[in-house]
């Protein structure tokens, strides 16, 4: 086979293979595009479904959470009507005080667990009062819920007598007053009663007295420590009677109140205790904790009695509600109102959706049972799902392959592009130059030497430039001599130097005029500012004078004093305005006086006048009357007429010139330009002779 035949064979084979390959590539590309479109549609569909689901869940979440909390309470056996009341109370409390309705309902779970036998609306009342107390005393709902459970366990008999709702309102109100009175907190009071327990109640001590004692003790110690000391005191009262020779019980054998016991101890030992007395009390009561209580409360028996009386008067939550409202954050309240609206709407929707969701869940459960029964069907369903997932993965793989092929094509297109070729050429040239850098340096060095060797041929050009430069120097010297002739042509002619001086002076005058105009505008602005400040300050001073001098018991004298004060204030204001205007006029006069031939006297400012003070009490500030504003004849501005050109003449006469000329090393000083030029000509003639 010849070379030509082999070449024809290769070309033919290439043509036959290229077309099918192009078709395959096009098919792969089309398949990739269809796969990409399908994946986009699937992604958009899934995103839409998920987004709609999340939006619906977000809208229903508040209602779902509230229903869950109500379900927890319902598990304790609470009736449906009580749950409905609890739900409404929770939403109202949330919107009024900015607290979570869900937390409100969940706190009712703890209350119902701790207090058995709450019926009807009592659970909602207990929960609302507990959360109100938590809000007003800066405690958590969980802490106050436990506190209410503890208090109910101690004072269950009182609750039965008053009724659960009335009792909880009384306890909450007294707790709030104690917290406010003794600067403690709901947490501290809860810890105090938790430590005390039922010891005081067993001694038949009223709850108001317990609040008073525990509150006073918390001024110097924690709530739990206060409860411990009070409990130790109660435990030692019975044995201390015999040791101290005092009786701490009444005729019925019941323990006396704390104030009476303290007064008996005070009568025996005084207001304060020394070391020996404290030791004796410790022996009597049996503990240091009891002695600490006595030391703290012994000087405050009168105050303690008043505190107990004030606490005993409280039977509701009016003061507590006011405390809670003062702590409401309006933004939290607005947020909870929005949540409440979503809860109310969502609750009504859930009433319709819950049965449907239960049906769907039941169907799902039945479908699971059916699949467990017919395992073959479950297996084939699994195969179908697996195949669907596999086809989806295959589509994604084809899309990936199409993208890879496209990326490879783009890469080869870039490699074959003019930009890449130029870049490659530059890089190659740089590598070539770096590789043969020594040879290039030798070549450049030789080139420079050869160019320098050829510089002889440039001498004619340099000579031509020298001739031109010499001609220019001759022309410049000639022009200099011509200019010199003007110096002696006329005595009245200015030299070029004098012309520059006059031109600079004229420009300076113009510039000063512009600056004066700007300064005048600034003075006018300052005048307006002064007037504004004077007027406003006068109004303020006048109002303050009215408020200060008015006496309802002596209205006539008050009016006279106010009139005098207002007169002085407004006369001072008028004086300030006049002086500000005079300052601006004097500024204009000063600028006019800077011109030759003008001498206008300045206008005097309005100052205090003793004569005016003697003439009228109303002019106490020294303001003179209108007659004093006129100027005397000697002070009147005198405007003298000036002949034409007198300003220029005056400027010329007032100008002193000093000229200095250095010629050939000789310095000539003179005020006469003609004299300088004459001396120069004499020097030249002497040199020429």
From Swiss-Prot:
Which UniProt key words apply to this protein?
Answer: Viral release from host cell, Viral tail assembly
State if Membrane is listed as a keyword: no
Q: InterPro entries under this entry?
A: Phage_tape_meas
Q: Which residues cross the membrane?
A: none
Example of a GO biological process term: viral tail assembly
- Role this protein plays: Serves as a base for tail tube protein polymerization and acts as a template for tail length determination.
- Similarity comment: family membership: Belongs to the P2likevirus tape measure protein family.
What's the protein here called? Probable tape measure protein
Native source organism of the sequence? Haemophilus phage HP1 (strain HP1c1)
**Mind giving the lineage of the organism this protein is from?**
Viruses, Duplodnaviria, Heunggongvirae, Uroviricota, Caudoviricetes
């Amino acid at each position: 086979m010849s070379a030509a035949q082999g070449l024809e064979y290769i070309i033919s084979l290439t043509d036959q293979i290229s077309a099918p390959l192009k078709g395959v590539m096009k098919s792969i590309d089309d398949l990739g595009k269809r796969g990409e479109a399908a994946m986009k549609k699937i992604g958009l569909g899934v995103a839409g479904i998920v987004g709609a689901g999340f939006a619906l869940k977000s809208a229903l979440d508040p209602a779902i959470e509230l229903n869950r909390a109500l379900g927890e309470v319902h598990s304790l056996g609470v009736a449906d009507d009580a749950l409905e009341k609890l739900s409404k109370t929770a939403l109202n409390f949330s919107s009024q005080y900015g607290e979570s309705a869900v937390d409100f309902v969940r706190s009712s779970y703890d209350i119902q667990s701790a207090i058995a036998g709450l019926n009807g609306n009592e659970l909602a009342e207990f929960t609302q009062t507990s959360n109100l107390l938590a809000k007003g005393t800066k405690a958590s709902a969980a802490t106050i819920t436990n506190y209410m459970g503890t208090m109910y366990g101690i004072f269950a008999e009182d609750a039965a007598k008053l009724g659960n709702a009335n009792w909880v309102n009384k306890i909450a109100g007294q707790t709030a007053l104690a917290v406010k009175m003794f600067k403690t907190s709901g947490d501290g009071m809860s810890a105090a009663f938790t430590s005390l327990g039922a010891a005081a109640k067993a001694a038949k001590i009223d709850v108001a007295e317990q609040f008073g004692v525990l509150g006073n003790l918390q001024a110097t110690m924690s709530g739990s420590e206060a409860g411990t000391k009070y409990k130790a005191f109660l435990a030692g009262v019975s044995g201390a009677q015999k040791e101290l020779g005092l009786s701490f019980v009444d005729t019925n054998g019941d323990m006396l109140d704390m104030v009476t016991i303290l007064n008996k101890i005070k009568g025996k030992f005084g207001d304060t205790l020394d070391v020996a007395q404290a030791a004796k009390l410790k022996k009597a009561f049996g503990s240091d904790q009891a002695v600490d209580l006595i030391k703290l409360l012994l000087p405050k028996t009168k105050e303690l009695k008043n505190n107990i009386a004030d606490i005993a008067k409280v039977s509701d939550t009016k003061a507590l509600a006011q405390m809670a409202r003062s702590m409401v954050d309006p933004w939290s309240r607005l947020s909870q109102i929005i949540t409440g609206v979503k809860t109310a709407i969502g609750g009504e929707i859930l009433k319709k959706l819950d049965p449907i969701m239960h049906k769907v869940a039941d169907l799902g459960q039945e479908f699971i049972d059916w699949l467990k029964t017919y395992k073959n069907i479950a297996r084939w369903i699994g195969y179908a799902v697996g195949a669907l997932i596999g086809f989806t993965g295959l589509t994604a793989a084809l899309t990936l392959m199409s993208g890879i092929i496209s990326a490879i094509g783009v890469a080869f297109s870039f490699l074959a592009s003019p930009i890449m070729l130029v870049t490659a050429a530059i890089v190659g040239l740089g590598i070539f130059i770096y590789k043969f850098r020594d040879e290039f340096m030798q070549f450049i060095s030789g080139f420079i030497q050869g160019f320098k060797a050829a510089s002889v041929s440039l001498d004619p050009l340099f000579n031509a430039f020298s001739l031109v430069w010499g001609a220019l120097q001759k022309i410049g010297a000639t022009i200099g001599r011509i200019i010199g002739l003007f110096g002696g042509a006329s005595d009245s002619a200015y030299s070029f130097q004098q012309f520059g001086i006059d031109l600079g002076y004229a420009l300076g005058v113009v510039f000063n005029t512009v600056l004066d105009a700007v300064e005048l505008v600034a003075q006018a602005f300052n005048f307006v500012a002064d007037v504004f400040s004077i007027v406003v300050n006068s109004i303020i001073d006048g109002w303050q004078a009215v408020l200060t001098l008015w006496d309802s018991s002596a209205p006539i004298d008050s009016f006279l004093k106010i009139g005098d004060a207002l007169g002085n204030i407004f006369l001072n204001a008028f004086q300030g305005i006049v002086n500000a205007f005079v300052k601006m006029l004097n500024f204009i006069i000063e600028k006019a006086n800077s011109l030759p031939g003008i001498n206008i006297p300045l206008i005097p400012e309005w100052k205090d006048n003793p004569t005016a003070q003697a003439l009228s009490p109303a002019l106490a500030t020294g303001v003179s009357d209108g007659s004093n504003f006129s100027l005397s004849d000697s002070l009147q501005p005198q405007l003298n007429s000036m002949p034409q050109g007198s300003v220029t003449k005056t400027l010329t006469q007032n100008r002193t010139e000093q000229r200095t000329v250095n010629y050939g090393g000789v310095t000539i000083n003179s005020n006469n330009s003609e004299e300088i030029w004459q001396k120069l000509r004499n020097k030249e003639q002497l040199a020429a002779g």
